[in-house]
Amino acid sequence: MPRVKRGVTARASHKKILDAAKGYRGRRKNVFRVANEAVMKAGQYQYRDRRQRKRQFRALWIARINAAARQHGLTYSVFMNGLSRAEIGVDRKVLSDIAIFDKDAFAKIVDQVKAKLAA
């Protein structure tokens, strides 16, 4: 079996890592050993934050809906309870957008919710 020198393969793999580390500060951008650790850590952050993004957006939508509902005299939990009782199937993302961009429509939804809660 012939001897295999790793020159081409090693250069390719190092180049791939160093290209991924472009824009990093200090030795992280041009020293392979340090750059490799930085790129691996960046991958861990990406993986974690893709999941956290979903939680953070849901929390943002809830905060917006809560603020809008309180302007109409309801808390978030009471408002969401009324939504389910009124069988209004609108998710939090859409409700948040309605609360920001179409205040009249949100007011109508709140009126329906209040009517259902009073009944």
Swiss-Prot record:
Transmembrane segments: none
InterPro entries (UniProt xref): Ribosomal_bL20 (IPR005813), RIBOSOMAL_L20_CS (IPR049946), Ribosomal_protein_bL20_C (IPR035566)
Alphabetical keyword list: Ribonucleoprotein, Ribosomal protein, RNA-binding, rRNA-binding
Keyword match DNA-binding: no
GO CC field: ribonucleoprotein complex; ribosome
Pfam families per record: Ribosomal_L20 (PF00453)
CDD domains: Ribosomal_L20
Annotated GO biological process: ribosomal large subunit assembly; translation
GO MF, one annotated term: rRNA binding
Family: Belongs to the bacterial ribosomal protein bL20 family.
Role description: Binds directly to 23S ribosomal RNA and is necessary for the in vitro assembly process of the 50S ribosomal subunit. It is not involved in the protein synthesizing functions of that subunit.
Identification of the protein by name: Large ribosomal subunit protein bL20
Encoding gene, per UniProt annotation: rplT
